[in-house]
Regions:
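N-terminal glycine-rich anion-binding loop in soluble enzyme alpha/beta folds
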Residues: 2-56
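Glycine-rich phosphate/diphosphate-binding loop of Rossmann-like nucleotide-binding domains
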Residues: 16-30, 133-198, 207-208
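Short, acidic/small-residue loops that bind anionic groups at enzyme active sites
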Residues: 96-130, 187-196
């Protein structure tokens, strides 16, 4: 940073037709762009003098590190100055910011990490990918709904297939969490196709895996 961030922003402007706001030290961003002959057309700069160190306690983002690019960017998102926030920083701090700065959609119990992963055919979305140590069935149902919405609206997948990651394909497999989640997912407003084993993931057997 900031070279690769500027390059990524420039590509997003050219290929996606979006307006990009670069959040960081404005002087360093402009100097880097000039040195590498990168245009800043279609990009705005929101000055943030500091960077959140990955070794810091994630919760310190809110009070001790409000001047960092991560905190400033997420506050801008909360204030309606953007529609999405892209960050390669601390996952823990990002989740703290998402929960307490940006805030969750009303009714959503937990924020989640949702990486889109490649397969032999089409990519799938894994949710949650590591944000939560312990979940309840209703949370997995919410993850399924959010994941389906993402795959449908962003990845343009019609009726995304939702599967529950489990130790076996049969609906009687798993712990109480998986058993109850299966029942609730079957009743949820998603295209639930049942359990899926880890060995099936590379073949693209589902579009959303919870």
């Amino acid at each position: 940073a900031p070279l690769e961030v500027i390059r990524g922003g420039a590509r997003a402007v050219q290929e996606l037709g979006v307006t990009v706001t670069l959040v960081g030290d404005e002087q360093k961003i402009r100097a880097c762009a000039e040195k590498n002959r990168l245009p800043l057309d279609g990009m705005e700069i929101l000055h943030a003098p500091a960077v959140f160190d990955i070794h810091e306690e994630p919760t310190s983002l809110l009070k001790q590190h409000a001047d960092t690019s991560m905190a400033v960017g997420m506050q801008a998102l909360h204030d309606g100055k953007g529609d999405a926030f892209v960050c390669a920083g601390s996952t823990g701090a990002l989740l703290v910011g998402a929960t307490f700065l940006v805030k969750r959609i009303a009714g959503i119990k937990r924020a989640a990490v949702a990486p889109v992963l490649p397969t032999e055919t089409t990519p799938f979305l894994l949710i949650d990918g590591g944000a939560n140590n312990d979940c309840r069935p209703e949370m997995l149902v919410q993850f399924a709904i959010m994941g389906s919405a993402y795959m449908q609206n962003v990845m343009h997948v019609d009726k995304p297939r939702v599967a529950l990651l489990n130790v076996g394909a049969e609906e009687t497999k798993g712990r109480e969490l998986e058993l109850e989640s299966y029942v609730q997912l079957a009743q949820a407003p998603v295209n639930f196709i049942g359990n899926i084993e880890a060995r099936e993931l590379p073949a693209g057997a589902a579009d959303v895996v919870v």
